[in-house]
């Protein structure tokens, strides 16, 4: 087996980043996280930083907005994984420029980890965020940088604890709001599993210049099926309140940030079916559970047990 690629994370202490960094370290990859000096002493990040230290993660001092520090950090590694948040998506052009100058990167994973932005029917404000991600894809391709785009669909930890009920702090016990007719299938993946699959793809020639879709069959489920599964677990039938698409579109326009973003992404997935309304063609994509059948992923059924 060839030696494992060295991986640099940019945005590694963020929401999804920390899971992928952990998966990288646990799989024995030499793992580097770009951090600003201030982040190392930030109380809000102390738990994540301590966990990284315990896992043997290396910290590289630098900044997305300091070109020289970025180039220097990238020159030390083989693979760059960006997990920057919503507000920094457009700034990934700076990573592309640094990768280009460094000239040694075997693979770049831009910050994706959601819907496939090239196959989207999203309305605003999600539309603009997806367009920003798509522009980054085009820039990566135009520069001839080897890539993998990870389309991991929904984070289980974000949507399942409340069954996607806006403003709720726990899963519903009496009534549940369902967007649209509840029939399009969506996909929910546990964040740790997203980390595992992403890291498996790093040195895999089958994922080179492809979209890696994470579509576990057991986690591909319509909203109606999700509610039925939850009802079975709590031994209770919920009142289902369906919100027609027309009403949902109006709600999106009237909502403030961040609710309008959440609702517009929910509309794309639960009404338009953007997780599952296309076939994965070998010309552009591969599917994670097919490539890595040995990975035991957490199913939606298992995941919901903790909330009963």
UniProtKB/Swiss-Prot annotation:
GO terms for biological process: lignan biosynthetic process. Keywords: Allergen, NADP, Oxidoreductase. Gene3D superfamilies: NAD(P)-binding Rossmann-like Domain, UDP-galactose 4-epimerase, domain 1. NADP(+) binds at residues 11-17, 36, 45, 137. Its EC number is 1.23.1.-. GO terms for molecular function: phenylcoumaran benzylic ether reductase activity. It catalyses: (-)-dehydrodiconiferyl alcohol + NADPH + H(+) = (S)-isodihydrodehydrodiconiferyl alcohol + NADP(+); (+)-dehydrodiconiferyl alcohol + NADPH + H(+) = (R)-isodihydrodehydrodiconiferyl alcohol + NADP(+). The active site is at 133 (proton acceptor). Oxidoreductase involved in lignan biosynthesis. Catalyzes the NADPH-dependent reduction of phenylcoumaran benzylic ethers. Converts dehydrodiconiferyl alcohol (DDC) to isodihydrodehydrodiconiferyl alcohol (IDDDC). Belongs to the NmrA-type oxidoreductase family. Isoflavone reductase subfamily. This is Phenylcoumaran benzylic ether reductase Pyrc5. It comes from Pyrus communis.
